[in-house]
Amino acid sequence: TKEQKNQRLNAILIVAFGLTFAAGAWTPLYDFVAIYLQAAHWPLNPAPDIAGPTERLLMATTGGLSVALGVAIWTSAHDVWNASPLAARRLIRNTAWSWFVVDSTFSIVAGAPMNAALNLVFLAMVLLPMRGAHAEAEAAA
């Protein structure tokens, strides 16, 4: 379906973001991630220096978790959807909202409120393809 295709495209974009972020832990590729970090910390703080091993580990971990999120969305849209579109939508929706609430809340706590705003782009990207379909599916169930 068109909804599944949109979710698979979203999954690819999220995996690409995660791979870029993880690869940014390698010093020659940090500049690509620094652009995002500067936007996420704007206007309160400059982007942090990630020269230390702990910061680079956190980038690698964040990237890895983003890749896993993208793979989960792909699997839901591709495999789970065929068995139960409603279950796939719930899985994607609940995963997206749990990520958004935790990531955005603690981004604000960390002094990077713009990251919460940037997170809205990812949240919309994942949830908008399901608009309307969820209510129809639950009514039919």
Predicted segments, located by residue:
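Alpha-helical transmembrane segments of helical membrane proteins, especially in multi-pass transport
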Residues: 58-74
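Alpha-helical transmembrane segments and their membrane-interface exit regions
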Residues: 38-41, 120-133
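Membrane-helix boundary connector in multi-pass membrane proteins
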Residues: 101-118
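Short juxtamembrane and helix-loop transition motifs at transmembrane-helix boundaries
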Residues: 50-55, 72-87
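Membrane-helix boundary elements
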Residues: 16-57
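Short, charged juxtamembrane terminal tails flanking transmembrane helices
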Residues: 134-141
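Cytosolic juxtamembrane helix and N-cap/initiation of the first transmembrane helix
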Residues: 1-23
